[in-house]
Amino acid sequence: MTKLIFMGTPDFSATVLKGLLESDQYEVLAVVTQPDRAVGRKKEIRITPVKEVALSYGLPIYQPEKLSGSPEMEAIMNLGADGIVTVAFGQFLPSKLLARMNFVVNVHASLLPKHRGGAPIHYALIQGDKETGVTIMETVKEMDAGDMISRRSIPITDEDNVGTLFEKLAIVGRDLLLDTLPAYLSGDIQPEAQDPSQVTFSPNIRPEEERLDWNMTNRQLFNQIRGMNPWPVAHTLWQGERFKIYEAELADGEGQPGEILEIGKRQLLVATGEGALVLKTVQPAGKPKMTISDFLNGAGRNLAVGDKFGN
Protein backbone atom coordinates (compact mmCIF):
# COMPACT_ATOMS: atom_id res chain seq x y z
CA MET A 1 0.00 0.00 0.00
CA THR A 2 1.35 3.41 -1.02
CA LYS A 3 1.73 5.82 1.90
CA LEU A 4 0.68 9.39 1.09
CA ILE A 5 0.59 12.85 2.55
CA PHE A 6 -2.30 14.89 1.17
CA MET A 7 -2.14 18.67 0.82
CA GLY A 8 -5.18 20.73 -0.17
CA THR A 9 -7.73 23.26 0.98
CA PRO A 10 -11.12 23.81 -0.79
CA ASP A 11 -14.07 21.55 -1.62
CA PHE A 12 -12.35 20.57 -4.87
CA SER A 13 -9.47 19.13 -2.83
CA ALA A 14 -11.79 17.45 -0.34
CA THR A 15 -13.46 15.44 -3.12
CA VAL A 16 -10.08 14.10 -4.26
CA LEU A 17 -9.04 13.32 -0.67
CA LYS A 18 -12.22 11.28 -0.13
CA GLY A 19 -11.41 9.27 -3.25
CA LEU A 20 -7.96 8.39 -1.92
CA LEU A 21 -9.34 7.49 1.51
CA GLU A 22 -11.96 5.19 0.00
CA SER A 23 -9.36 3.40 -2.15
CA ASP A 24 -7.65 0.28 -0.81
CA GLN A 25 -4.39 1.17 -2.60
CA TYR A 26 -3.38 4.16 -0.48
CA GLU A 27 -2.82 5.01 3.15
CA VAL A 28 -3.11 8.73 3.89
CA LEU A 29 -0.70 9.32 6.78
CA ALA A 30 -1.57 12.99 7.32
CA VAL A 31 -3.29 16.00 5.81
CA VAL A 32 -1.77 19.46 5.37
CA THR A 33 -4.19 22.35 4.83
CA GLN A 34 -4.40 26.10 5.32
CA PRO A 35 -4.94 27.50 8.85
CA ASP A 36 -8.44 28.17 10.16
CA ARG A 37 -9.59 31.66 9.16
CA ALA A 38 -12.00 34.23 10.57
CA VAL A 39 -14.55 35.03 7.86
CA GLY A 40 -17.52 37.34 7.38
CA ARG A 41 -18.65 40.33 9.37
CA LYS A 42 -18.95 38.27 12.54
CA LYS A 43 -15.37 36.97 12.11
CA GLU A 44 -16.46 33.41 12.73
CA ILE A 45 -13.68 30.83 12.58
CA ARG A 46 -14.05 28.55 9.57
CA ILE A 47 -12.07 25.39 8.92
CA THR A 48 -11.20 24.23 5.42
CA PRO A 49 -13.24 21.52 3.66
CA VAL A 50 -10.13 19.32 3.63
CA LYS A 51 -9.80 19.66 7.40
CA GLU A 52 -13.46 18.64 7.77
CA VAL A 53 -12.78 15.41 5.87
CA ALA A 54 -9.56 14.76 7.81
CA LEU A 55 -11.36 15.20 11.13
CA SER A 56 -14.11 12.79 10.09
CA TYR A 57 -11.47 10.14 9.32
CA GLY A 58 -9.37 10.88 12.41
CA LEU A 59 -6.29 11.82 10.38
CA PRO A 60 -3.36 13.86 11.72
CA ILE A 61 -3.71 17.47 10.51
CA TYR A 62 -0.99 20.08 9.97
CA GLN A 63 -1.87 23.73 9.31
CA PRO A 64 1.31 25.80 8.93
CA GLU A 65 0.93 29.45 8.00
CA LYS A 66 4.01 28.88 5.85
CA LEU A 67 5.30 25.36 5.22
CA SER A 68 8.90 26.26 4.43
CA GLY A 69 11.15 26.03 7.49
CA SER A 70 8.27 25.21 9.82
CA PRO A 71 8.21 22.56 12.57
CA GLU A 72 5.28 21.04 10.69
CA MET A 73 7.47 20.43 7.64
CA GLU A 74 10.05 18.61 9.73
CA ALA A 75 7.31 16.43 11.21
CA ILE A 76 5.88 15.71 7.76
CA MET A 77 9.27 14.62 6.41
CA ASN A 78 9.62 12.14 9.27
CA LEU A 79 6.29 10.37 8.68
CA GLY A 80 7.80 7.85 6.28
CA ALA A 81 5.54 8.72 3.36
CA ASP A 82 6.26 7.47 -0.15
CA GLY A 83 4.95 10.64 -1.72
CA ILE A 84 2.67 13.66 -1.68
CA VAL A 85 -0.53 14.50 -3.55
CA THR A 86 -1.39 18.22 -3.71
CA VAL A 87 -4.71 19.66 -4.84
CA ALA A 88 -5.25 23.44 -4.62
CA PHE A 89 -3.11 23.61 -1.49
CA GLY A 90 -2.28 27.29 -1.81
CA GLN A 91 1.43 27.20 -0.97
CA PHE A 92 4.62 26.31 -2.82
CA LEU A 93 6.38 23.19 -1.57
CA PRO A 94 10.00 23.68 -0.42
CA SER A 95 12.75 21.98 -2.44
CA LYS A 96 13.88 20.14 0.69
CA LEU A 97 10.47 18.49 0.96
CA LEU A 98 10.27 17.66 -2.76
CA ALA A 99 13.69 16.01 -2.60
CA ARG A 100 12.70 13.80 0.34
CA MET A 101 9.76 12.13 -1.45
CA ASN A 102 9.74 9.37 -4.05
CA PHE A 103 7.06 11.29 -5.91
CA VAL A 104 5.02 14.50 -5.62
CA VAL A 105 2.06 14.98 -7.94
CA ASN A 106 -0.45 17.80 -8.31
CA VAL A 107 -4.05 17.76 -9.52
CA HIS A 108 -4.69 20.99 -11.47
CA ALA A 109 -8.07 22.16 -12.78
CA SER A 110 -7.11 23.03 -16.34
CA LEU A 111 -5.79 21.46 -19.52
CA LEU A 112 -2.16 22.44 -19.07
CA PRO A 113 -0.14 24.21 -20.30
CA LYS A 114 -3.17 26.54 -20.55
CA HIS A 115 -4.36 28.32 -17.40
CA ARG A 116 -1.49 27.89 -14.98
CA GLY A 117 -2.20 29.65 -11.70
CA GLY A 118 -4.77 30.04 -8.97
CA ALA A 119 -7.97 30.73 -10.95
CA PRO A 120 -8.01 28.34 -13.93
CA ILE A 121 -11.75 27.62 -13.74
CA HIS A 122 -12.66 31.31 -13.57
CA TYR A 123 -10.54 32.19 -16.60
CA ALA A 124 -11.72 29.25 -18.68
CA LEU A 125 -15.21 30.76 -18.41
CA ILE A 126 -14.18 34.42 -18.68
CA GLN A 127 -12.16 33.75 -21.83
CA GLY A 128 -14.98 31.75 -23.41
CA ASP A 129 -13.18 28.39 -23.63
CA LYS A 130 -15.26 25.59 -25.14
CA GLU A 131 -13.66 22.93 -22.95
CA THR A 132 -11.70 22.57 -19.75
CA GLY A 133 -10.42 19.66 -17.72
CA VAL A 134 -7.91 18.35 -15.23
CA THR A 135 -4.19 17.67 -15.52
CA ILE A 136 -2.21 15.38 -13.22
CA MET A 137 1.40 16.54 -13.22
CA GLU A 138 4.68 16.15 -11.42
CA THR A 139 5.30 18.93 -8.91
CA VAL A 140 8.32 21.17 -9.45
CA LYS A 141 9.40 24.48 -7.90
CA GLU A 142 7.92 26.56 -10.74
CA MET A 143 4.15 27.02 -10.51
CA ASP A 144 2.16 24.39 -12.45
CA ALA A 145 5.16 23.76 -14.72
CA GLY A 146 5.79 20.07 -14.08
CA ASP A 147 5.66 17.30 -16.66
CA MET A 148 2.12 16.11 -17.39
CA ILE A 149 1.17 12.58 -16.33
CA SER A 150 -2.40 12.61 -17.67
CA ARG A 151 -5.19 14.94 -18.80
CA ARG A 152 -8.95 14.58 -19.13
CA SER A 153 -11.30 17.13 -20.72
CA ILE A 154 -14.98 18.05 -20.39
CA PRO A 155 -17.08 20.51 -22.45
CA ILE A 156 -18.10 23.92 -21.10
CA THR A 157 -21.74 24.83 -21.75
CA ASP A 158 -23.54 28.18 -21.48
CA GLU A 159 -25.24 26.81 -18.36
CA ASP A 160 -21.92 26.42 -16.54
CA ASN A 161 -20.50 28.80 -13.97
CA VAL A 162 -17.58 28.56 -11.53
CA GLY A 163 -19.66 26.57 -9.07
CA THR A 164 -20.86 23.94 -11.55
CA LEU A 165 -17.40 23.49 -13.07
CA PHE A 166 -15.80 23.14 -9.63
CA GLU A 167 -18.18 20.29 -8.86
CA LYS A 168 -17.67 18.59 -12.23
CA LEU A 169 -13.89 18.96 -12.25
CA ALA A 170 -13.51 17.75 -8.66
CA ILE A 171 -15.04 14.44 -9.73
CA VAL A 172 -12.92 14.36 -12.90
CA GLY A 173 -9.81 15.08 -10.83
CA ARG A 174 -10.60 12.38 -8.29
CA ASP A 175 -11.27 9.75 -10.95
CA LEU A 176 -8.31 10.73 -13.12
CA LEU A 177 -5.91 10.56 -10.16
CA LEU A 178 -7.19 7.13 -9.12
CA ASP A 179 -7.03 5.90 -12.73
CA THR A 180 -3.56 7.33 -13.35
CA LEU A 181 -1.53 7.00 -10.16
CA PRO A 182 -1.00 3.19 -10.19
CA ALA A 183 0.38 3.21 -13.75
CA TYR A 184 2.54 6.25 -13.01
CA LEU A 185 4.02 4.69 -9.87
CA SER A 186 4.73 1.43 -11.71
CA GLY A 187 6.56 3.30 -14.48
CA ASP A 188 4.01 2.47 -17.18
CA ILE A 189 3.28 6.16 -17.85
CA GLN A 190 5.99 8.43 -19.20
CA PRO A 191 5.23 12.05 -18.23
CA GLU A 192 5.16 14.61 -21.05
CA ALA A 193 6.81 18.02 -20.88
CA GLN A 194 4.59 21.08 -21.32
CA ASP A 195 4.97 23.08 -24.53
CA PRO A 196 6.35 26.49 -23.43
CA SER A 197 4.78 28.20 -26.46
CA GLN A 198 1.30 27.20 -25.28
CA VAL A 199 1.59 28.40 -21.67
CA THR A 200 -1.03 30.88 -20.40
CA PHE A 201 -1.56 32.15 -16.86
CA SER A 202 -4.73 32.53 -14.80
CA PRO A 203 -3.77 34.28 -11.55
CA ASN A 204 -6.23 34.97 -8.75
CA ILE A 205 -8.93 37.47 -9.73
CA ARG A 206 -8.08 41.07 -8.77
CA PRO A 207 -10.85 43.30 -7.35
CA GLU A 208 -10.74 45.66 -10.34
CA GLU A 209 -11.47 42.73 -12.67
CA GLU A 210 -14.83 42.15 -10.97
CA ARG A 211 -16.36 45.38 -12.33
CA LEU A 212 -18.43 45.08 -15.50
CA ASP A 213 -17.64 47.36 -18.46
CA TRP A 214 -20.90 47.74 -20.36
CA ASN A 215 -18.97 48.75 -23.50
CA MET A 216 -18.00 45.10 -23.92
CA THR A 217 -20.15 42.71 -25.95
CA ASN A 218 -23.00 40.80 -24.33
CA ARG A 219 -21.06 37.55 -24.79
CA GLN A 220 -17.97 38.97 -23.06
CA LEU A 221 -20.05 40.25 -20.14
CA PHE A 222 -22.03 37.00 -19.96
CA ASN A 223 -18.75 35.09 -19.68
CA GLN A 224 -17.42 37.48 -17.03
CA ILE A 225 -20.59 37.15 -14.93
CA ARG A 226 -20.64 33.35 -14.96
CA GLY A 227 -16.84 33.27 -14.59
CA MET A 228 -17.29 34.96 -11.20
CA ASN A 229 -20.42 33.16 -9.95
CA PRO A 230 -20.68 32.25 -7.09
CA TRP A 231 -17.43 34.04 -6.22
CA PRO A 232 -16.04 36.68 -6.29
CA VAL A 233 -19.17 37.98 -8.18
CA ALA A 234 -19.16 40.55 -10.97
CA HIS A 235 -20.61 43.97 -10.18
CA THR A 236 -21.61 47.32 -11.63
CA LEU A 237 -22.85 50.58 -10.11
CA TRP A 238 -26.49 51.46 -9.44
CA GLN A 239 -27.33 54.75 -7.74
CA GLY A 240 -23.63 55.09 -6.98
CA GLU A 241 -23.41 51.83 -5.05
CA ARG A 242 -22.13 48.36 -5.85
CA PHE A 243 -24.71 46.17 -7.58
CA LYS A 244 -23.73 42.52 -7.92
CA ILE A 245 -24.90 40.41 -10.85
CA TYR A 246 -24.80 36.64 -10.35
CA GLU A 247 -26.67 35.46 -13.41
CA ALA A 248 -27.68 36.85 -16.80
CA GLU A 249 -28.80 35.61 -20.21
CA LEU A 250 -27.79 36.66 -23.71
CA ALA A 251 -30.37 38.73 -25.58
CA ASP A 252 -30.84 40.98 -28.60
CA GLY A 253 -31.13 44.70 -28.06
CA GLU A 254 -29.56 48.02 -28.96
CA GLY A 255 -28.88 51.12 -26.89
CA GLN A 256 -26.24 52.99 -24.94
CA PRO A 257 -24.00 50.60 -22.97
CA GLY A 258 -25.55 50.03 -19.54
CA GLU A 259 -28.91 51.51 -20.57
CA ILE A 260 -32.10 49.80 -19.41
CA LEU A 261 -34.03 48.89 -22.57
CA GLU A 262 -37.00 47.05 -21.15
CA ILE A 263 -38.60 46.38 -17.77
CA GLY A 264 -41.10 43.56 -17.31
CA LYS A 265 -42.57 41.83 -14.28
CA ARG A 266 -39.75 39.29 -14.34
CA GLN A 267 -37.29 40.82 -16.77
CA LEU A 268 -34.72 43.58 -16.94
CA LEU A 269 -33.03 44.06 -20.32
CA VAL A 270 -29.76 46.03 -20.37
CA ALA A 271 -27.82 47.18 -23.43
CA THR A 272 -24.15 46.30 -23.90
CA GLY A 273 -21.54 47.37 -26.42
CA GLU A 274 -23.00 44.77 -28.76
CA GLY A 275 -26.35 43.11 -28.01
CA ALA A 276 -27.95 43.03 -24.58
CA LEU A 277 -28.28 41.02 -21.37
CA VAL A 278 -31.31 39.91 -19.40
CA LEU A 279 -30.42 40.14 -15.71
CA LYS A 280 -31.64 37.12 -13.72
CA THR A 281 -30.10 37.10 -10.22
CA VAL A 282 -28.72 40.22 -8.53
CA GLN A 283 -27.73 41.73 -5.19
CA PRO A 284 -28.14 45.45 -4.47
CA ALA A 285 -25.86 47.01 -1.85
CA GLY A 286 -26.95 46.11 1.68
CA LYS A 287 -29.48 43.54 0.45
CA PRO A 288 -29.42 39.75 0.09
CA LYS A 289 -29.02 37.98 -3.23
CA MET A 290 -32.40 37.92 -5.04
CA THR A 291 -34.21 37.14 -8.28
CA ILE A 292 -34.72 40.03 -10.68
CA SER A 293 -38.48 39.91 -10.05
CA ASP A 294 -37.92 40.41 -6.31
CA PHE A 295 -35.59 43.30 -7.09
CA LEU A 296 -38.09 44.96 -9.43
CA ASN A 297 -40.84 44.58 -6.84
CA GLY A 298 -38.65 46.04 -4.10
CA ALA A 299 -35.49 48.13 -4.23
CA GLY A 300 -35.69 48.51 -8.01
CA ARG A 301 -39.37 49.43 -8.31
CA ASN A 302 -38.54 53.01 -9.36
CA LEU A 303 -36.26 51.96 -12.21
CA ALA A 304 -37.25 53.36 -15.59
CA VAL A 305 -36.41 52.57 -19.19
CA GLY A 306 -33.46 54.78 -20.13
CA ASP A 307 -31.82 54.62 -16.69
CA LYS A 308 -28.23 53.39 -16.79
CA PHE A 309 -26.03 51.02 -14.83
CA GLY A 310 -22.35 51.84 -14.39
CA ASN A 311 -20.45 55.09 -14.08
UniProtKB/Swiss-Prot annotation:
Enzyme class at the top of the EC tree: transferase
UniProt GO cellular component terms: cytosol
Organism superkingdom: Bacteria
EC number: 2.1.2.9
Catalytic activity reported: L-methionyl-tRNA(fMet) + (6R)-10-formyltetrahydrofolate = N-formyl-L-methionyl-tRNA(fMet) + (6S)-5,6,7,8-tetrahydrofolate + H(+)
One GO MF term attached to the UniProt entry: methionyl-tRNA formyltransferase activity
Amino acids binding (6S)-5,6,7,8-tetrahydrofolate: 110-113
SUPFAM superfamilies on file: FMT C-terminal domain-like, Formyltransferase
PROSITE patterns: GART (PS00373)
UniProt keyword list: Protein biosynthesis, Transferase
Cytoplasm recorded as keyword: no
Signal peptide: none
InterPro entries named among the record's database cross-references: Fmt, Formyl_trans_C, Formyl_trans_C_sf, Formyl_transf_N, Formyl_transf_N_sf, Formyl_transferase-like_C_sf, GART_AS, Met-tRNA-FMT_C
Pfam families, per the entry: Formyl_trans_C, Formyl_trans_N
Membership in a protein family: Belongs to the Fmt family.
Function recorded in the entry: Attaches a formyl group to the free amino group of methionyl-tRNA(fMet). The formyl group appears to play a dual role in the initiator identity of N-formylmethionyl-tRNA by promoting its recognition by IF2 and preventing the misappropriation of this tRNA by the elongation apparatus.
Annotated protein name in UniProt: Methionyl-tRNA formyltransferase
UniProt gene name: fmt
